[in-house]
């Protein structure tokens, strides 16, 4: 290990957060025939978010092999953030069937009202000096103030047809359509045509093949509108009325193959995809907070391969093995950077089966091995957020015993007649006690050098459980 450091920190302070959300929905459907209907759908939600904290940390940073002291300091984070949002939605849905076709159409109107008032600042001190250190004035390492309101109307509609037909090649399912949307806040109108086709080959009905392509848009919501300019640690926030929806052109090719092995059903699924991305609104991740740039300033792509094998060892429960490969990058100011979601590989296993000769004892095994995500110091440019966390590795093992087996409904009296199964189990989560990293705490010394100190996820845990299936 090179350049090892020792780090000690003490925290104090308090955080009080408040999140309250109300949902409501209403639907009225008129059936003209068994195959045709018209539906009116109304929905609304309202949310209030209060984020309030004052957190102080005092730390010591030393060389691991000696007594040289690199940093002794304090940092304090302060926030008083308030957000209130109300969204009302009204829509019409129509569906009918005729001669192998299923026709669907819809219209939608959405009203949004959002108000934000946010104040944040962060102070860092090292060796008795406030960072950044300037001899003629006192400055904070970071501060932000935002007071904004948004009110807008979104109109959208779609038309789609699904056509099932047979030929010498097999049974086809062709789905094609178009979606239109308009937002009066930024005066943007988008048109999104899409098409997909599936084939069940006549030569081998164990296979299902499919291909899909189309234009997909991600309309911006409030967080994506916040154009944050950071100059000397001072963040200025204004809402970008010229923001556009992020666009993706999808090409997806896939297939399923079903078969039997060891007298059990299996299914193998493969999917290859490429997505051309444009009008990207870059973002960074600070712990669990997503911060958008608020500008369409990048293009990019995502390409990958997903493989998955399903098997049913316990009736009604799938076991599976999946392998995923992916690369996604974005181009900002002529430089290609990995996107925050760039997880290059992911291998996972879920296996459950009864003990040999028994239907009462059951074991469950979970394995996960995944690439770490890109990261970097908070409040920095995207070009500095290309470090990559170590791979995530985890093993879970569980054993269950069936106390009651009433799947044949032989219990006909009392509470037992309502119970299908009753299980008693024990699980070992993170069986090997691997120290996986959740996030990083950044420490700055007097030379303004930053060090990433890992925050680890929970180690090994033993869990006891009791469950009843009705």
What are these regions (language model features)?
Residues 2-6, 202-251, 265, 272-292, ...:
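Surface-exposed extracellular loop regions of Gram-negative outer-membrane beta-barrel proteins
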Residues 18-22, 84-88, 151-155, 189-191, ...:
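Residues that define the transmembrane beta-barrel architecture of outer-membrane proteins
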Residues 18-186, 269-272, 320:
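Face-selective signature of the C-terminal outer-membrane beta-barrel domain
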Residues 31-37, 97-102, 165-172, 202-207, ...:
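Short loop/turn motifs that connect adjacent beta-strands in outer-membrane beta-barrel proteins
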Residues 37-53, 242-301, 424-429:
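Membrane-embedded beta-barrel scaffold of Gram-negative outer-membrane proteins
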Residues 44-48, 98, 109-115, 155, ...:
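Transmembrane beta-strands of outer-membrane beta-barrel pores
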Residues 165-169, 273-276, 295-377:
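Gram-negative outer-membrane beta-barrel transporters
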Residues 369-378, 401-470:
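C-terminal beta-signal and adjacent terminal beta-strands/loops
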């Amino acid at each position: 290990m090179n350049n090892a450091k020792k780090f000690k920190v003490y925290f104090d302070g308090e955080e009080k957060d408040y999140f309250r959300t109300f949902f409501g929905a209403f639907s009225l459907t008129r059936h003209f025939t068994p195959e045709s209907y018209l539906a009116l759908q109304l929905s609304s939600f309202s949310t209030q978010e209060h984020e309030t904290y004052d957190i102080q940390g005092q730390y010591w940073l030393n060389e691991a092999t000696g007594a040289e002291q690199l940093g002794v300091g304090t940092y304090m984070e302060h926030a008083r953030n308030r957000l209130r949002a109300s969204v009302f939605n009204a829509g019409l849905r129509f569906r009918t069937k005729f001669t192998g076709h299923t026709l669907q159409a819809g219209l939608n109107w959405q009203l949004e009202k959002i108000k934000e008032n946010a104040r944040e600042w962060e102070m860092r001190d090292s060796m008795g000096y406030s960072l950044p250190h300037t001899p003629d004035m006192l400055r904070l390492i970071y501060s932000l103030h935002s007071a904004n309101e948004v009110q807008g109307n979104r109109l959208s509609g779609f038309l789609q047809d699904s056509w099932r037909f047979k030929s010498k090649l097999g049974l086809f399912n062709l789905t094609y359509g178009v979606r239109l949307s308009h937002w009066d806040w930024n005066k943007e109108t988008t048109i999104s045509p899409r098409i997909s086709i599936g084939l069940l080959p006549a030569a081998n009905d164990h296979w299902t093949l499919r291909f899909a392509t189309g234009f997909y848009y991600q309309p911006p919501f409030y967080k994506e509108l916040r154009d944050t300019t950071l100059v000397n640690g001072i963040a200025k926030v204004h809402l970008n009325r010229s923001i556009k929806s992020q666009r993706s052109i999808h090409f997806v090719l896939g297939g399923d193959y079903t078969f039997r092995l060891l007298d059990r059903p299996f299914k193998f699924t493969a999917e290859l995809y490429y997505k051309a991305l444009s009008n990207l609104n870059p973002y960074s991740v600070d712990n669990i907070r997503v911060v958008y740039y608020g500008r369409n300033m990048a293009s990019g792509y995502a390409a990958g391969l997903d493989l998955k094998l399903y098997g049913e060892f316990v009736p009604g429960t799938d076991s599976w093995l999946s392998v995923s490969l992916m690369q996604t990058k974005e181009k900002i100011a002529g430089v290609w950077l990995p996107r925050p979601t760039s997880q290059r590989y992911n291998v996972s296993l879920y296996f459950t089966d009864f003990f040999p000769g028994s239907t009462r004892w059951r074991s469950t095994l979970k394995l996960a091995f995944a690439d770490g995500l890109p990261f970097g110091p908070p409040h920095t440019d995207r070009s500095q957020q290309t470090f990559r966390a170590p791979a995530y590795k985890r093993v879970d093992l569980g054993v269950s015993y069936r106390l009651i087996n009433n799947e044949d409904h032989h219990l006909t009296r009392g509470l037992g007649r309502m119970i299908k199964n009753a299980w008693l189990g024990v699980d070992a989560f993170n069986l090997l006690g691997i120290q996986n990293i959740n996030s990083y705490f950044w420490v700055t010394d007097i030379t303004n050098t930053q060090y990433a100190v890992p925050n680890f996820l929970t180690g090994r845990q033993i869990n006891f459980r009791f469950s009843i299936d009705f």
